């Protein structure tokens, strides 16, 4: 969308001190409204979990884990996207300790390596990873507690998420407020985010809650999703999904639908009438190809391409309602409610954005990196350019250094979202932060 009158406009946002403050205010503002939609079995309908229940589950889990001596410790979380994964993450955010999200796709040896490097005392894991965790455990040092995030295993060494929730509720009903009353230091080390390691050993990016909420707060001035329903597709251990979708979505009152998996994206969008989806270029390019393949198979490709061309020339992307009527079959296949497709993680082919917009699916992209929590620049949802990453976020400064004759050089940035440094790597920190 490219409504120029919004070029320099900001949405109004409320101040937040830390992630605990954010969720407390969300529970007050949005209490009974759904925060999450989850599905335990494929053929079952999605079930809503309210903002109030989300807050209570965080307090219960945190109270239970704190009673087990985990206050101030590092807690690793690994598993597929799930509500329980998010609750464990925010229990750490409420003051329990340092959170260490880990990629479930890594081999057992690398998972053990990251657990050991982080000094994690607790591992919260998905039952689906049970066999891999059995390989991991003999390779780890320092783990004091295991938590089965979604299983029925109940024993002293490996309590289940549900057992801990009930245990925490009992402790709170008996007057235990040790966890509830923790005051969070927004400047303290909170999250250890391991990079992909594509350039060698994975680096541990150290984040404070101030780093993260600065990203949430400033991004919300450009993009508004309140009252919408978003599909959580990307892995939650990624800063992009966690900060931009989960945190920012909750801050604004989004209903987050936990996707059943990549092969269920379209069916989940349609079933839940999803309006917002964050993804990487590969996802959106695949969806785009699927639409065109279907049109070709139905003998409608020429008609679709001509309609896209006319829509673009007439700038109908500023009038999604008209586009929705022209491309009604495509909109019907996606539930008829899409208001935002947001791409990140890498540059996307601008034609994909232009085609989606011409069909009445507002779409834009941003730019960032884990070390900046992650967003550095992002298009405004009401004024965007298909071939640009967007303006720099409020509070962030960007420079290009060592530029060549064409102006291409290294991008450096400064702002409240810039990481604290690399974990146990003073040399790399000095090279990155000047």
Enumerate the predicted regions with their spans.
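Structural core segment of the AMP-binding/adenylate-forming
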Residues: 22, 94-167
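Conserved AMP-binding/adenylate-forming core of the ANL superfamily
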Residues: 32, 36-82, 86-90, 107-112, ...
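Conserved AMP-binding/adenylation subdomain of ANL enzymes
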Residues: 213-229, 236-327, 337
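Conserved pre-ATP/AMP-binding loop-to-beta segment of ANL
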Residues: 31-34, 148, 169-194, 201, ...
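Conserved AMP-binding A3 loop
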Residues: 48-52, 190-214
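ANL superfamily adenylate-forming
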Residues: 43, 131-185, 291-329
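Conserved AMP-binding/adenylate-forming
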Residues: 322, 326-434
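Conserved ATP-dependent adenylate/AMP-binding module captured primarily in the ANL superfamily
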Residues: 104-139, 213-231, 262-276
């Amino acid at each position: 969308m490219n409504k120029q009158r919004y070029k320099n406009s900001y949405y109004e946002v409320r101040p937040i001190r830390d992630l605990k403050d954010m969720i407390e205010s969300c529970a007050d503002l949005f209490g009974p409204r759904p925060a999450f939609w989850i599905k335990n079995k494929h053929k079952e309908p999605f079930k809503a979990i309210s903002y109030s229940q989300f807050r209570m589950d965080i307090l219960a889990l945190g109270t239970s884990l704190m009673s087990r001596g985990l206050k101030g410790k590092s807690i690793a979380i690994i598993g597929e996207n799930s509500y329980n994964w998010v609750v464990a993450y925010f229990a750490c955010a409420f003051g329990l300790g340092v959170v260490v999200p880990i990629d479930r796709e890594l081999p057992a040896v690398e998972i053990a390596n990251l657990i050991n490097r982080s000094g994690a005392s607790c591992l919260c894991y998905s039952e689906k990873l049970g066999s891999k965790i059995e390989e991991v455990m003999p390779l780890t040092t320092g783990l004091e507690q295991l938590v089965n995030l979604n299983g029925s295993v109940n024993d002293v060494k490996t309590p289940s998420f549900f057992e801990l929730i009930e245990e925490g509720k009992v402790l709170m009903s008996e007057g235990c407020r040790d966890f509830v009353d923790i005051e969070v230091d927004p400047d303290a080390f909170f999250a250890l985010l391991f990079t992909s390691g594509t350039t060698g050993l994975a680096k541990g990016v150290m984040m404070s809650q101030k780093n993260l909420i600065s990203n949430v707060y400033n991004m919300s001035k450009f993009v508004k999703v309140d009252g919408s329903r978003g599909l959580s597709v990307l892995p939650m251990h990624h800063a992009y999904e966690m900060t931009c979708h989960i945190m920012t979505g909750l801050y604004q009152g989004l209903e987050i639908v936990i996707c059943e998996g990549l092969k269920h994206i379209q069916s989940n969008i349609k079933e839940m009438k999803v309006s917002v989806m964050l993804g990487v270029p590969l996802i959106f390019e695949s969806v785009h190809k699927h639409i065109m393949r279907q049109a070709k198979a139905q003998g409608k490709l020429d008609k679709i391409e001509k309609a896209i061309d006319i829509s673009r020339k007439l700038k109908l992307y500023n009038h999604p309602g008209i586009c929705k009527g022209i491309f009604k079959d495509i909109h019907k296949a996606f539930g008829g409610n899409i208001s935002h497709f947001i791409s990140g993680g890498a540059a996307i082919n601008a034609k994909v954005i232009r085609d989606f917009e011409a069909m009445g699916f507002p779409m834009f992209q941003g730019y960032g990196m884990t070390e900046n929590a992650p967003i550095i620049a992002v298009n405004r949802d009401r004024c965007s350019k298909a071939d640009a990453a967007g303006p720099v976020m409020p509070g962030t400064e960007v420079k290009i250094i060592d530029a060549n004759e064409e102006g291409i050089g290294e991008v450096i940035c400064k702002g409240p979202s810039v990481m604290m440094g690399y974990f146990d790597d003073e040399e790399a920190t000095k090279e990155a932060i000047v």
